[in-house]
Amino acid sequence: LYNLVFYTTERGDSPVDDFLDGLDKKARAKVAAHLSLLEEQGPHLKRPYADVVRGKIRELRIHQSSNQYRMLYFFQVRNQVVLTHILSKKTPQLKEKDIELAERRMEDWLWRFPTGGTI
């Protein structure tokens, strides 16, 4: 199994967790099901569930009713998956600002936890 870790800021805030708290019960259940697949399959999880975005950043592709969510993440040492960003997708392609945010959070995480770890 892969260890899923929510990105947290230096202050201890978890933007992904905060976003998930705002979802309704059905949407949270769908996200949880996709996270279970990621936890089980790691980098072997492919489309339609996951895809490479750019560099080390990947996306978990979640469709629930008429909503589409994208959770951006990267793999770190010891089978660790760091979940950096989640968004409600309204356009055909991910916005550059969302990709850049995930990359900044990845850089921040790797700087603070170069060998992996959790808060």
Name what the model sees in each region.
Residues L1-Q68, V77-V81, S88-I119:
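Basic, Lys/Arg-enriched alpha-helical interface segments
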